[in-house]
Regions:
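Preference for long, well-ordered alpha-helical segments
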Residues: 23-26, 105-191
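Carboxylate-rich helix-loop segments that flank metal/cofactor sites and access channels
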Residues: 62-103, 165-175
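Long, non-catalytic architectural segments outside compact domain cores
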Residues: 194-195
């Protein structure tokens, strides 16, 4: 860990840990929504998200402690704006349709994935194998979670739009099938050649 300033790494880990906790809080608030209870796939997904983000948050906290990092006043200020945005999501959780909550989860998980991509690069630059392992595992898990949300999202949209449960199920499954095609390997560009 000689190439990168330890304080910078610690601040970055603390920043990501705070973001992870805010997203986890939003997920926990969503679980209280009566509307969520109407879609069993959403209930199962929120349980999965809560478990995964709880574990990730604990590992990030341990990494922050290892770097003797505490959330600074400056960082708290920066996070306050974002936390305010998330608080809006949380406050709306009880009245928002499930599809909107799933969309917000998709966005939040994507932001966490970007943060863990940055953390992986930081850990590589710092030659910190433990942090590389944490970031890599979290990123892989977040990719799976985003994919799971992408399956529940179209189903929740269709169920909110159609009154006929059989028709909603049929079209919902078709929507999942059609939208999941975008996640096929041929739609992902090969890694750029590094010269």
């Amino acid at each position: 860990m000689s190439r990168v300033d330890k304080d910078r790494i610690g601040n970055f880990v603390s920043d990501l840990h705070s973001l992870e906790k805010h997203v986890l809080n939003a997920i926990q608030k969503q679980k209280e929504s009566d509307k969520i209870q109407e879609i069993s796939e959403a209930v199962e997904l929120l349980d999965l998200l809560e478990d995964a983000l709880t574990e990730q948050s604990q590992r990030l906290n341990q990494a922050a402690v290892r770097y003797d990092s505490a959330i600074t006043t400056e960082l708290k200020s920066k996070l306050a704006g974002f936390a305010g945005s998330l608080a809006g999501l949380v406050d709306g959780a009880r009245k928002d349709p499930v599809s909107k909550l799933m969309r917000d989860n998709y966005t939040a998980l994507s932001m966490l994935a970007a943060g863990h991509t940055m953390l992986k690069a930081t850990a590589l630059a710092a030659d910190d194998e433990d942090l590389q392992h944490i970031a890599g595992n979290h990123l892989a898990e977040l990719a799976q979670l985003v994919t799971e949300v992408s399956r529940v999202l179209p189903l929740s949209v269709v169920r909110e739009l159609l009154d006929d449960p059989e028709q909603a199920e049929e079209i919902g499954q078709l929507a999942i099938e059609k939208t999941q095609k975008a996640w096929k390997g041929e739609n992902i560009r090969e890694a750029p050649e590094i010269v």
